[in-house]
Amino acid sequence: MKFRIYITILALSIIGFQHLMGQGSKISGFISSEEGPARFVNISNLNSSFSTMTDTAGYYKLSNIPEGTYDLQITGVGFETLTKKVVVAKDASSILNFLLTKGNNTLNDVVVTGTLKAVRRTDSPVNVEVYTPSFFKKNPTPNIYEALQNVNGVRPQLNCNVCNTGDIHINGLEGPYTMVLLDGMPIVSALSTVYGLSGIPNALVERIEVVKGPASSLYGSEAVGGLINIITKDPNKAPMLSTDIFFTTSKEYNADVSFKVNAADKASILTGINYFNFQNIIDKNHDNFTDMTLQNRISLFQKWDIKRKNNRQFSLAGRYMYEDRWGGDLRYDSSFRGGDSIYGESIYTNRWELLGNYELPFTEKMMLSFSYNEHEQDSRYGKTSYIASQKIGFTQLTWDKNAGNHDLLFGIALRYTYYDDNTPTTQNADMLKNKNAPHITWLPGIFAQDEIALSKKHKILLGIRYDYNSYHGNILTPRFAYKWAIDPENMIRLNAGTGYRVVNLFREDHAALTGAREVIVANELNPERSYNVNLNYIRKFFIKDGTYLAFDLSTFYTYFNNRIVADLEQDPNKIIYDNLQGYALSKGINLNMDISFPFGLQIIAGGTWMENTLNQNGVRTQQLLTEKFTGTWAVSYTYPKSNISIDYTGNVYSPMRLPLLSSTDPRSPSSPWWSIQNIQLTYTGLKKVEFYFGIKNLLNWTPNKGNPFIIARAHDPFDKKVNYDANGQILATSENPYALSFDPTYIYGPNQGIRGFFGLRFKIL
C-alpha cells in the first residue's frame, strides 16, 4: 500500500514539475561572425545557472526560462566576450541573433612566417605558434627578450653574470641557431643579437610568430633551430594614444608611449617611445659585484602606412636605440672604464634600423621588401677593449602566383653584411701591412615554393633555395611539408628540411671577451649542415558546457654535420672553437595545452622534453647549459562583475650541465630543478585606464643558492694573484685553494630575487 502511495506521489510530482517547466519562456537564434556561423559558442546567464551551446550550424535554443531580466553572456574561443541585457516576458518565445567579433585567440590568426604568405594559421602547412600582447601582459616585462620566457620550448639564456648578455634558445639549441626577424626582415642578426634583443620594446608588438625547426629554404642562414618573427603594429589599427608605465621595488622603471597621426587620406603614422632605467646597485650574494647589470636605454620607433591605389601595400618603419649598461665591482664608475684597477664591463650601444614593403604596381602580386641597419658597439670588458661596427642590408622580391590548385611563390634575395672590430679577427693576414680588413659578406639567393592543394583535406608544400656565400660558396636547402586536416578539430602536419649556418665568434660565445679566456680557432671553420624532421598533431575539443580544450603535440629530430663547438672545458684559460669530429643530435617532444572554461578560468600550459648531445669519437656528451625538460604555464581567472583578473605564470627547468674551470672547482657541476613564478592582479573597471600589480619570482630563486659563489675569484678579476706552473696551468695556493681564475660565465638563470611591481595602462581609441 505504501509503495503505491509513493508511486502516485512521484508521478504527480513529475507531472507537476513538467507543467511548471512548460510555463517558462524560450529564447533561440543564430550566432555568427564575419567568417560565418559560430560553432560551439557558449550562451549563459550571469544571474542563474542555465546555459547552452550553439550547434555546428551556429543555432542555439534556451528553454524553460522564468520571466525576468537577464544578462546573457556569449563566449567562444577566438571571439570577444559579448554581454547583452535581455527582458523575458511570461510564456514568450524570442528570437535573438548575435554577431561576434574576433578576439585574442590564435587558432585562426593570419600568419606569414611559415610560408611568406598571409594565410590563416589553420590553413598553413607549417605549424606557426602565435602570441599576442594579451598573452605577454600576463607577466609584464620591459622587452621582448624577457617576455619570451613564457613561451614553451623557448628560453632566454643569460650568458654573463656581469653584463647580462643573453640569447634565445629554441628546443635547447643555442642562440646562434635562432633567427630573429622584425616584420619578416633579418634586422636582429649576428652582433645585434648579443645586446640588441633587450632593446625591442613590447609596445611595438602586434604579435609574435614562432616556427620551431629549420626554415633556411625561405630565410637562409641562421634559421636552423627556428625563427621568431616580431610583427609590429599596423598604424591603421593602432589606438590614437597608448601608454604603459610600470616600476618594480628593485627600482626598475619602464615607460612605453605610442600615438597615431592620420595625415589626411594619404598616410597613417605610428610613433612609439620606450624608456627603461635601472640604476640601483644590488649585491644580495655579497660578492662585491652587481647582481644585475645597470641599464639606461631609450628606443624610438616610427611606422608609416602610405595609402595607394587599389589598396596596394607601402609601409616604412624606422627605429633608433641607445643603451648604456654596466656591471661589475660595486666601486666601479666610468673613470675606471678600460683600466685594470676596478673591474667593470661597460657597453655603449648605438643602433638604427630602416625597413619597408612596397607592392609593385602590376596585376601580378609582387612585393619588394628591404631593410638596412647599423649597429655600433663601444665596450670594455675589464681592460679588454672591444669596439665593433656592423652594417646589414637586405632586399627581397617575391612573386605570389596562383595556378589552379598550385599556390606558388618565387623570390630573389640579396644580403650584404659588413663587420669590423678592433681585434685580430678583422686584421689583414699580412702583419707587415697592419691594415684593417673588415669582413664583407655577399649572400645572393633565389628560392621557389609550391603549395599544392591535393584536396580540401590534404596539402603538400615543396620548397628549395639556392644561396651563394662569398666566403663559403654554393648552398642548397630543400624543404617539404604535408598537412592533413582530418576534420576541423584534428590536424596533422609533417615538415622536413635542411639548414646551414656560418660562425660569428663574438656571437657564438660572449665569454670570448670577458678577458678571462683566450680565443683559439683550432682549424678553419666550415659551415654547419643540419637535417630536420618535425611531426605535429593538433586536437581540439568543444564540450557542451562551453569548455574548450586544445592540444598541440610536436616531435622533432635534428641531425648536425660540422657542428661548430666552443670548448670551455679543455682549458680554463681558453675557448677553443672547432668543427665537431662527429655529429650532434637534437630531439624531443613539445606539448602545448589551452583550456578555457565558461566561468572565466583559462589555463595555457606546455612542456618540452629534449635531448641535445654531441657525439665525437664514439663518446656522447650532453650539451652544456641545456635542460632536458622545461615547462611553462599561465593560469588566468576573471572575477564576474568585479573587473578584476588574476594571472599566475611561471616556468620550471630540469638540471643542466654547467661549465666548471677544473675538477677542483667547488661550484655545482649541474643546476638544480628551478622555477620562476609570478602573480598579477589587473583592474579594468575604468573606461580608458587599467591598473596592474603583483609579485615576480615568488619563490625568491637565484642561481647562487647551493653554491659557495657563482663568479669565480670576483675579488681578483684581473688574475693578479693567480700563479701558473711551467705548462701554464693554474697552481693551488693558500690564496687560491681551488686553482681558479676569474670566471663570470657560470650562469644559467636570472640573478634577481623576489620583487613587487605596479603599473598602469592608458588608451584612447
Can you annotate each of these PLM segments?
Residues S63-N64, H169, M185-K212, L300, ...:
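Short acidic/polar hinge/loop motifs at secondary-structure boundaries
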Residues I95-F98, I144-A147, G166-H169, L181, ...:
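N-terminal periplasmic accessory domains that precede
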Residues F30-L46, T75-F79, A89, S93-K137, ...:
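Short, acidic, small-residue-rich periplasmic hinge/interaction motif at the N-terminus
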Residues M367-S379, A485, R493, N526-N579, ...:
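Membrane-embedded beta-barrel scaffold of Gram-negative outer-membrane proteins
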Residues F278-S299, D305-M366, Y372-K391:
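Flexible loop and strand-edge segments within Gram-negative outer membrane beta-barrel domains
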